[in-house]
Amino acid sequence: MAVIKTKIVLDADVIILFAKGGLLSLLPRIFPEYEYIVLDIVYKEVKQPILNQLNNQIKFFQNIREVTFGDTIEQKREFARLTDVMGLGRGESACMVFCRYNHDVIGSSNLRDIVAYCEKHEIVYLTTIDFLFYGIQRKVITKDQANEFITIVNSMGSRVPQVDFDTYICSKI
């Protein structure tokens, strides 16, 4: 009998940041007890050259899986409400709805758009900093690598906060 793992549903922002920072291949090693997925809607948001890195994870390493979003009418309605009525992005909306109805974890750094919905529906979410924190705790990366990652992605125009990983606390998982 196959073990069904809880999924970490990656939003485009986390994929893009980890690809820019050179750590996309290590991301699935941070929580190996979870299955990492990218929804087809999110996959379509990822552009080259990052798409090449994502495809390598999906096709060659097989540690991230692409999944089609919207199995039920209920999910499709909620997605339409979030995108059309609330004006949220398609990727974030798909991830939140998927996690709500499947009891999975969202990986997103778009806190402005996800926090209220996730808290209302008791959806666990992990940010880029949370992944880095747990990566350090689980000895997948070092503090120096995490800090270098932040410096690199910020030099490319991203806005990842500098944190002190010795005092940072994350108790989401």
Where are these regions (language model features)?
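Histidine- and aromatic-rich ligand-binding microenvironments
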Residues: D11, V38-D40, L88-G89, G107-L111, ...
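PIN/NYN-family metal-dependent endoribonuclease catalytic core
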Residues: K5-L10, K20-G22, L26-D71, I129-F133
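Acidic catalytic patch
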Residues: I64-V85
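Acidic, metal-associated active-site segment
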Residues: G89-V105, D113, Y134, F149
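Alpha-helix capping/helix-boundary segments
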Residues: V14, V42, C95, D113-I114
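Short active-site loop/helix that positions an aromatic residue
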Residues: F18-L26, V115-H121
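Acidic, PIN/NYN-like endoribonuclease modules and their adjacent C-terminal/linker elements
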Residues: I114-I173
